Curated annotation (Swiss-Prot):
Gene (name only): aroK
Organism field: Synechococcus sp. (strain JA-3-3Ab)
Similarity comment: Belongs to the shikimate kinase family.
Annotated binding of Mg(2+), by residue: S26
The UniProt record lists the keyword ATP-binding: yes
Binding site for substrate: D44, R68, G90, R147
A GO MF term: shikimate kinase activity
Any one GO BP annotation for this protein: chorismate biosynthetic process
Keywords recorded for this protein, A-Z: Amino-acid biosynthesis, Aromatic amino acid biosynthesis, ATP-binding, Cytoplasm, Kinase, Magnesium, Metal-binding, Nucleotide-binding, Transferase
Cofactor note: Binds 1 Mg(2+) ion per subunit.
Keyword ATP-binding attributed: yes
Protein name per the record: Shikimate kinase
PROSITE patterns according to UniProt: SHIKIMATE_KINASE
Cofactor: Mg(2+)
Predominant cellular place of this UniProt entry's protein: cytoplasm
Amino acid sequence: MIQPEEAERLRGVTVYLIGMMASGKSTLGAELAAQLRRPFFDTDALVEQVAGCSIAQIFAEQGEAHFRELETQVLAQLSGYTRLVVATGGGIVLRPKNWSYLHHGLTVWLDAAPELIWQRLKRDPGQRPLLQTPDPQAALQRLMQEREPFYAQADVRVPIHSEASPSQLAEQVWQAICARLRAQPPCNR
């Protein structure tokens, strides 16, 4: 459990979780926010609120470009606040404009192993528009290769190779954040 005085090391900086779909951003984000005693937001959930429909519907009816624009609008609004934990959509890193917002905080890449992501996705079929192809595993591999250079720009990288409880992962992420803060304290960018 993260102690309140430890959480103050962030100096009000928002934590943005980035990474592939099914890397655990939403589940871990909620746990990390609870331990840091901060509000939690999920950009995918906010996009669905703004659009009044599911992400799958947005993709089907208006296309990925429209979804990405809504995602950028949501991120722009969140970047105006401090002391948040934000789980982002897997593709948020693809737009340079989004990085200008992400740089208002500390970015943490949840670098989940490909086989772990695939196992999680198999338990939740049909909910990922970008994987609605004849070969979803190949599509996932392509997306991972395309996005990895963008994820690598994160302030902190946390490798995740096996299933762990949200509290264990939150501790792992917090330790990685603390190591980064020791090396380079935040300046409320």
